[in-house]
Amino acid sequence: MTNSRNKGAQFERDIAKKLYQLLGVNFARDLDQYRAADHGDLIPDDPDFPFVIECKRYAAGTGCMPGWWAQVWRAAERTKLLPCVIYKYDRRDIRCVIPLGAVFECSHDYTIEMDLETFAYICREIMADD
C-alpha cells in the first residue's frame, strides 16, 4: 500500500506541475483527502478554476473506472465545482475525463475523455467566461 500511495502522490505532484505549465495556475496536494471523504486531490490557487480533480495512477486498466467517477462526483457536489478525473496507466498517455455538460448542456451521466492539453484548453475557456 505504501508504494501505491507513493505512486499516487508522485502522480498528483506531476499533474500539478503539468497543469501549472499549461495554465499558470498553482496546485497543492489536498492532504485532507486522507482524513476525510469527498475531497479532490489537488487544490488550485485560482478561485475561478472550475474543476475538482481526482488523480488516479495504476499499472493496468482501460478507461475511467466508474468508482473513480462516482468518487469525484461526490467531491464535486460538496465543493460546487465540476468533476474531473485525471488518470494514467503504465505505458499509456495521461487522460482526463469531465462531464460533457462542462462543454455542452446535458446530463452529468455523459462524459468526455481527452488529453491533458485539451483539458487545459477547456479550463482556460471556462475561466475566461467568468
Regions found by a protein language model. Give the residues of each.
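Catalytic phosphate/metal-binding cores of nucleic-acid and nucleotide-processing enzymes, i.e., regions
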Residues: 1-130
